[in-house]
Amino acid sequence: MKHYQFLSLKKANEPYVDEIRAAWEQILDDGWYLHGKFAARLERELADLCHAGHAVACSNGLDALRLIFRAYVEMGVMQRGDEVIVPANTYVASVLAVTDNGLVPVFADIDETTMNLDFAQAEQKITSRTKAIMVVHLYGSPCWSPDAVRLAERYGVKIVEDNAQAIGASSRFAGLHGTHATGGLGDVAAFSFYPTKNIGAMGDAGAVVTSDKQLASAVRALANYGADTRYHNIYRGLNCRMDELQAAVLCVKLGHLEEITVARRERAAIYDAHIRNPQIVKPRIFSEDVQVWHQYEIRVPKRRDEFRDYMARHGVETDIHYAVPPHLQPCYR
């Protein structure tokens, strides 16, 4: 029986091996492993992709989010005890970044048709302590609507994007600055380049993207021990830098983003065409949005575990995203 892996990182990286090796040879020849030309290039290309003014490469997606909230605290935009609205269905990293900075996560429910944050539910959670709403573009689907802009303007809250799963996606609705690309819709966005992502590193890597110059400067300093210049530490910072090896991998893969996305769309179209079982709820697709299919998520409301067992017996791996949501994790009960 043929076995179908949920994901093969070896197969995912095979098309780019020669380019990656050539880039790594440049790094070995240069002897420059941090703050080099590949990280600088990656930052420029990410900012351009999102139609944003600034990008800061960093160590991973969680640190990208942590740096965003830490920067807002250092800038006086937020203070300990302030609230951040987060979707109830997301990876725990989205919430860890909030609590790590002394902020309070407030969980809002999702829209079952999109699996993303329900902005009507989010509005009901807003209080005088609310300083931000986190939108997570889950599974590669843009989490955006005119309501996001309305809430930001009406309540004066920041919109923080968790764009870990949706690089290259875009919304049919314009963002706060008139752009449509995820990562440039809100005030600031965090990216993850964990190996399983659409654009994945050979280890951990992340980035922060924003058009707010002051915020970008604070994030950059905080990621480098809090230093704005060498041996001049304006913050009690962290060590959250991206090394040149990971930056080089990401530069290579980012150059292939369009073909990677097209391939994912083609596979999603096959699923759409051939999944006809009425007990399986397929993803809702908005034709005006650009969905990048980080995952092809389905719901089997009545017989999920039985369905997974059936798939496993036929050699097909599946997973649950997420088996235990953050608000039910022991650390957040």
Predicted segments with their positions:
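Short, glycine/acidic-enriched loop or turn micro-motifs at the edges of active sites
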Residues: K11, Y91, E112, G140, ...
